[in-house]
């Protein structure tokens, strides 16, 4: 289980000002709780690529944003990610939903290529990442922020189960 309120507590610890992205079924509960939050502003975009440009601009303007999207949207965002957050050296953390993860288990009836392409893409693009499978992994968010600041580049934390 991955509880949205515990993720939000980690974001508060990092003093996140904005969460930028596109909601999906896996992050629905997290978005719902963020919309009710009084200090973190949620900014929705129509495409995931816009999230990286907008978050990069917010960072340059002095805000402390986070991108929240799904892996399929991350694929769509590739060039915008490269041209903004990565090339500009923005220490931006993304929480990325891992659609299709369970389809890679032995005996699964079908494999979702969104899952099989995901980690190889992160590796090819030199994006440091970890994966949260449950509440015990939420500390990875803090580590992602430390790593992003250390290398002055984006990092990612993958959200494997749906948030509750």
Give the positions of each predicted feature:
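Thiamine diphosphate
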Residues: 1-164
């Amino acid at each position: 289980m991955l509880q949205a309120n515990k993720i939000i507590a980690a974001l508060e610890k990092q003093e996140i000002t904005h969460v930028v992205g596109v909601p999906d079924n896996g992050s629905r509960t997290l978005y719902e709780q963020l919309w009710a939050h009084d200090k973190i502003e949620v900014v929705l975009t129509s495409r995931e690529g816009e999230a990286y440009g907008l978050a990069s601009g917010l960072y340059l303007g002095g805000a402390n944003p986070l991108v929240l999207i799904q892996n399929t949207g991350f694929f769509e965002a590739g060039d915008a990610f490269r041209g903004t957050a990565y090339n500009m050296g923005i220490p931006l953390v993304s929480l990325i939903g891992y659609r299709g993860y369970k389809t890679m288990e032995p005996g699964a009836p079908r494999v979702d290529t969104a899952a099989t392409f995901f980690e190889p893409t992160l590796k090819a693009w030199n994006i440091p990442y970890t994966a949260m499978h449950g509440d015990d992994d939420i500390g990875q968010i803090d580590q992602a922020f430390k790593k992003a600041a250390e290398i002055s580049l984006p990092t990612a934390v993958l959200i494997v189960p749906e948030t509750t």
